């Protein structure tokens, strides 16, 4: 287990004595927490390096996070900018490479409280969509911060539907320039991070027109502000969109372009280019221009979305062994609230989700890296599957992490409503992920189209090997399975093959039913597009089931690989069982629909689920400790490693500046009101 010095880093005078209620949870562990941390990090060397980086960050006063809860929005923005450029100087002095693990670990401990994250997204787009010459030019400028960029895709009137983007890029062959223009109010770029006050350039997504022919969405590098005094350039209207639900430190912005001219060479041209005479040449597929967004989406899973749920689990679980409420028996002292089955039922499934998603993200990352280099070489055979997997997992991660973080917040009662708990910030960030980089429902429906296409491909040659093999992730839909679950007892439902088969069966049935319903409507004369729209609710249900099956399968396979770590394998197997069964019980109607499960079998699954709760509860603190987020990173009065919740809440509240300042409302309103009533009396 990591040392208390590593984990406790807030400098409070009581931090070196761990509260006995949480200390007892760590006695006689059933597995090595340190070894599990190494597994989650991808090996001991990674853990060592991560902690070294975190120690450097946490010892630097510029990176302090404790004052964030008391700052204004403008102060939060300036603080986040200061942190980013201090980090760049530090990285340069220590020789950290742009894409090295040190950067990832530094951002992990800073918990997203640095700005210019869209600078990295824009660099991803340049590396993915730019030619070698463009990468050499623009990539170096970005790397050296000679320019600061953002990725400007979303518009006031369009988001996830990229074909509907209205911003225009018209090629002027006489001057060999591209004219970038916002023709309508709704074509205003809206939401790009860092655009409001910070960036000098933007990778702008716009509809390309050459010689009067429209060629769809492409990416263009457009200067936004002067490199001399940071004022907007001619034809540019730019600013901040105003207050938001969360992410107050980020200057999300708007951008209007009034016939702004850029050189022809500013169009990113790995997969398409415009020749000087206006001839358009496509070097890839129409979907190639989504590659930059796909890269960002894969990175978001582990670095941007999942940590919110992991941290929420740590905070809520630690608080739940410190908080005592009511009695299990009249003669007993008040019990830790984690002893109550209802609290376990809230929190432990979220812990299971955190682990399931970690191993799923690892699997997807491996698939991404194995296919990305091929795509850059214009081999697009794996692009549809990679798009479907990344899209489905982004939607699934965002949905479950937002819901789970909120469940954790509510599980902490009133204290979870305090920003000092850290939970409202985590909930707001997870909630934002449900709409940025694609609105989740739209993303699920993109997965559904892929599933329907794959299902029809499988049905074209039933019982035979199809001419074109099915993508690996959907091969299960062509497999014949029993129409009834084989489980006879509650214990049977803790067999991975039983619940994995159950999820594969239900997912396949829902995909089949959605495809058949769409085809039936089309055969009855309904237009193809209308038929799709009239069945999207069914397709959405199928896509969600497919995504859940993928996560169950990935978790199961990850646990199976831990056969040389029997203690860890045992505890993770319980979490895997809980994750799969929680999904079955939450969606029991889908399993009962055609009799795959009987009512009695659902009762057995519930019994198995409830039996798992006390087993996992014994290891709950250790399982959250294994995520190895330091107190600095959690920045939570409720979730510190030492368990001194109430002392920390009280001390942090004393630091609120308003508590030591004169209250202007007293003289202006309260005192006159009180005096007025006294005179009337």
Swiss-Prot record:
GO terms for biological process: bile acid biosynthetic process; fatty acid beta-oxidation; fatty acid beta-oxidation using acyl-CoA oxidase; fatty acid metabolic process; very long-chain fatty acid metabolic process. InterPro entries: ACO, ACOX_C_alpha1, Acyl-CoA_ox_N, Acyl-CoA_Oxase/DH_mid-dom_sf, Acyl-CoA_oxidase, Acyl-CoA_oxidase_C, AcylCo_DH-like_C, AcylCoA_DH/ox_N_sf. The keyword tRNA processing does not apply. Keywords: FAD, Fatty acid metabolism, Flavoprotein, Lipid metabolism, Oxidoreductase, Peroxisome, Phosphoprotein. It catalyses: (25R)-3alpha,7alpha,12alpha-trihydroxy-5beta-cholestan-26-oyl-CoA + A + H2O = (24R,25R)-3alpha,7alpha,12alpha,24-tetrahydroxy-5beta-cholestan-26-oyl-CoA + AH2; (25S)-3alpha,7alpha,12alpha-trihydroxy-5beta-cholestan-26-oyl-CoA + O2 = (24E)-3alpha,7alpha,12alpha-trihydroxy-5beta-cholest-24-en-26-oyl-CoA + H2O2. Its EC number is 1.17.99.3. CDD domains: AXO. The modification N6-succinyllysine is found at residues 66, 137, 303, 453, 561, 667. A motif (Microbody targeting signal) lies at residues 679-681. GO terms for molecular function: 3alpha,7alpha,12alpha-trihydroxy-5beta-cholestanoyl-CoA 24-hydroxylase activity; FAD binding; fatty acid binding; flavin adenine dinucleotide binding; palmitoyl-CoA oxidase activity. Most abundant in liver. Also expressed in kidney. Not present in any other tissues tested. GO terms for cellular component: peroxisome. Its cofactor is FAD. The modification Phosphoserine is found at residues 3, 9. The keyword Lipid metabolism applies. It is found in: Peroxisome. PANTHER family: ELECTRON TRANSPORT OXIDOREDUCTASE (PTHR10909), PEROXISOMAL ACYL-COENZYME A OXIDASE 2 (PTHR10909:SF344). Homodimer. Oxidizes the CoA esters of the bile acid intermediates di- and tri-hydroxycoprostanic acids. Capable of oxidizing short as well as long chain 2-methyl branched fatty acids. Belongs to the acyl-CoA oxidase family. This is Peroxisomal acyl-coenzyme A oxidase 2. It comes from Rattus norvegicus (Rat).
